[in-house]
């Protein structure tokens, strides 16, 4: 047997040769790593000395040549180059030679890995984690920062009960289930920490009953985007809040004016302005007087011009001012909207159009009356007044414009929209009850001469009022049978209305708490952003100094945990701890290559 020390091109290495077979060797790789079996993070079987190595030692002990002395110093590992880093796999799993890759790929797939979650250890296979390579546990580079070489495991200081659901996500191939003893916000934080992705988060929210938030598109043009934010989102800026305040004041003034103009004293003044009294006509001169023949000075009472009188009405002036603002706001929002089709289909925009439409019809009708012969026929005037009353009634819908600036009205609208099925059931149950009890009370009161129910349709009103527990008292049963029917009608109405009400209340609570949670999260994000900016200004200089002194600070610098970033602080000790972890990793690899049980021998 012959033993010799053979120098290598890329670094010194010791090779034992005996009996024509190559013995154990320790070769320094170009990257400064030892070419050894993949062991980091794996729960492998205990190592046994290879037969070749045992034979070599036995031959050396039986009188062969003594082993050459160990080198005094091991060559220092150099930093990996950019080309090596591109093809580098999981450093915690060692390296695999190209000719051994096909044979070892299957074994690596079934290798076991230990994961320590705040002291609770989980054991799984690499193939299970590799199903989702974009996640924290599935990506070898991402999970390396949490590897502990001394314990040969990955350590995460996270919530332990939540990891049952996280590990089940890998084992089940993508099914995410929240443990019953973990709250929603905690499990959502764990999903974000382990980087399971937006798709997993959306599925989790849908399974938990969350309604998907609709994305709000913005115009592409910068000017249109700014205008759209000012008029559509009052919370976006200070100018948007000012515009919202002006809009709310105009809406309130319009509604107050709509109500005050119906008071008797104001209505009488408006009638005087619209139709002032005609002064008495002088008597006609006698026939033949002043040498003139008989003539008629006037054919009837004259009507004063209406246009100046109408424009002098203060209610008309206030209404015109409000409509000018509403029209300006509608046109600006239509100009800046991201989609004209979506804008036209929006129910709130339809309400805005309906709110200003009656004014122009009323103004056109009054201007038409000023034309000669415009108001000659009384029948046409009566028809015009009836149409104007109906059109003016539409102005009351302006109150719904407040929902654009009120979160409470928006929550109420979303609640009614989500409870349409329950409201439909309520109306259907009331319809059945009205038919049954109106028919019953009619036949129960049919023989009584003083009955208030002349027909079944006439009893519909009584049934509706009784089932809704209002009871005006204008129609009431008199006989004993009619009173029994009325009692049953009232009881049935209470039960019918009470059944769908809890569902509607539950929907209201859901939307209310969701809105308050969004406001709290927005405030929290704003505070965190301020703290992050302040901490970045305070610790920027210190971080540069520490990185210049620590040799491995460049590696440990970008590996700050998301928790520390979320808190807005980055302890300086983390650079030193990660540098020490990398040194321990290389020391462990050298000790394993030399088959020595003590790392201090290095």
Swiss-Prot record:
Glycosylated. Sumoylated on Lys-212, and Lys-525, preferentially with SUMO3. Sumoylation regulates the voltage sensitivity of the channel. SUPFAM superfamilies: POZ domain, Voltage-gated potassium channels. Residues 66-78, 276-286 have a biased composition (Pro residues). Residues 407-420 are annotated as: S4-S5 linker. Expressed in the heart (at protein level). Expressed in the brain and weakly expressed in the thymus, skeletal muscle and spleen. GO terms for cellular component: cell surface; intercalated disc; intracellular canaliculus; membrane; membrane raft; perinuclear region of cytoplasm; plasma membrane; potassium channel complex. It comes from Mus musculus. Its main location: membrane. It comes from the Eukaryota. A lipid is attached at residue 337 (S-palmitoyl cysteine). GO terms for molecular function: alpha-actinin binding; delayed rectifier potassium channel activity; outward rectifier potassium channel activity; potassium channel inhibitor activity; protein kinase binding; scaffold protein binding; signaling receptor binding; voltage-gated potassium channel activity. It is found in: Cell membrane. One of its GO terms (biological process) is membrane repolarization during atrial cardiac muscle cell action potential. Belongs to the potassium channel family. A (Shaker) (TC 1.A.1.2) subfamily. Kv1.5/KCNA5 sub-subfamily. Voltage-gated potassium channel that mediates transmembrane potassium transport in excitable membranes. Forms tetrameric potassium-selective channels through which potassium ions pass in accordance with their electrochemical gradient. The channel alternates between opened and closed conformations in response to the voltage difference across the membrane. Homotetramer and heterotetramer of potassium channel proteins. Interacts with DLG1, which enhances channel currents. Forms a ternary complex with DLG1 and CAV3. Interacts with KCNAB1. Interacts with UBE2I. Interacts with XIRP2; the interaction is required for normal action potential configuration in the heart. Residues 1-107, 274-297 are annotated as: Disordered. This is Potassium voltage-gated channel subfamily A member 5. There is a cross-link at residues 212, 525 (Glycyl lysine isopeptide (Lys-Gly) (interchain with G-Cter in SUMO)). Residues 261-314, 369-384, 443-456, 477-483 are extracellular. Residues 457-468, 469-476 dip into the membrane without crossing it.
């Amino acid at each position: 047997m012959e033993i010799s020390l053979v120098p290598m091109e890329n670094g010194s290495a010791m090779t034992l040769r005996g009996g024509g077979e190559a013995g154990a060797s320790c070769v320094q790789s170009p990257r400064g790593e030892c070419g050894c079996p993949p062991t980091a993070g794996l729960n492998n079987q205990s190592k046994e000395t290879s037969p070749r190595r045992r034979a070599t030692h036995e031959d050396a002990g039986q009188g062969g040549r003594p082993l050459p002395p160990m080198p005094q110093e091991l060559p220092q590992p150099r930093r990996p180059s950019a080309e090596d880093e591109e093809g580098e796999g999981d450093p915690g799993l060692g390296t695999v030679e190209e000719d051994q890759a096909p044979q070892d790929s299957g074994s690596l797939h079934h290798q076991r890995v230990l994961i320590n979650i705040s002291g609770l250890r989980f054991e799984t296979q690499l193939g299970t984690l590799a199903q989702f390579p974009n996640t924290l546990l599935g990506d070898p580079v991402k999970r390396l920062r949490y590897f502990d070489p001394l314990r040969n495991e990955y350590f995460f200081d996270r919530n332990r009960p939540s990891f049952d659901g996280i590990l089940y996500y890998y084992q089940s191939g993508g099914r995410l289930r929240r443990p019953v003893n973990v709250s929603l916000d905690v499990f959502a934080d764990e999903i974000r920490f382990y980087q399971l992705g937006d798709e997993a988060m959306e599925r989790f929210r849908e399974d938990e009953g969350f309604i998907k938030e609709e994305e709000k598109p913005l115009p592409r043009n910068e000017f249109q985007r700014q205008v759209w934010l000012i008029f559509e989102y009052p919370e976006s800026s200070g100018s948007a809040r000012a515009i919202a305040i002006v809009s709310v004041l105009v809406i309130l003034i319009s509604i107050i004016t709509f109500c005050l103009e119906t008071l008797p004293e104001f209505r009488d003044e408006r009638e005087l302005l619209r139709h002032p009294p005609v002064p008495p006509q002088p008597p006609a001169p006698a026939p033949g007087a002043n040498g003139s023949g008989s003539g008629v000075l006037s054919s009837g009472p004259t009507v004063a011009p209406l246009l100046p009188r109408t424009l002098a009405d203060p209610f008309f002036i206030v209404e015109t001012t409000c409509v000018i603002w509403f029209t300006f706001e509608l046109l600006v929002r239509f100009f800046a909207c991201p989609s004209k089709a979506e804008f036209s289909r929006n129910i709130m925009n339809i309400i805005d159009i309906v709110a200003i439409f009656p004014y122009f019809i009323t103004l056109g009708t009054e201007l038409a009356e000023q034309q000669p012969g415009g108001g000659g026929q009384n029948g046409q005037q009566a028809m015009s007044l009836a149409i104007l009353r109906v059109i003016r009634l539409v102005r009351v819908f302006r109150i719904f414009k407040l929902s654009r600036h009120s979160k409470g009205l928006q929550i109420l609208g979303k609640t009614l929209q989500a409870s349409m099925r329950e409201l439909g059931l309520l109306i259907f149950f009331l319809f059945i009850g009205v038919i049954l009890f109106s028919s019953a009370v009619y036949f129960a009161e049919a023989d009584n001469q003083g009955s208030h129910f002349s027909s079944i349709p006439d009893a519909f009103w009584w049934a509706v009022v009784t089932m809704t527990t209002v009871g005006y008292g204008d129609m009431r049963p008199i006989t004993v049978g009619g009173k029994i029917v009325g009692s049953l009608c009232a009881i049935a109405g209470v039960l019918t209305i009470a059944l769908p009400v809890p569902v509607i209340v539950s929907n209201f609570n859901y939307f209310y708490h969701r809105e308050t949670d969004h406001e709290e999260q927005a405030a929290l994000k704003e505070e965190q952003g301020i703290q992050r900016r302040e901490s970045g200004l305070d610790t920027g200089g210190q971080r540069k100094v520490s990185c210049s002194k620590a040799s491995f600070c460049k590696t440990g610098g970008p590996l700050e945990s998301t928790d520390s970033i979320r808190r807005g602080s980055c302890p300086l000790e983390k650079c030193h701890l990660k540098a020490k972890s990398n040194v321990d990793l290389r020391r462990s690899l050298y000790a394993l290559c030399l088959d020595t049980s003590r790392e201090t021998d290095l």
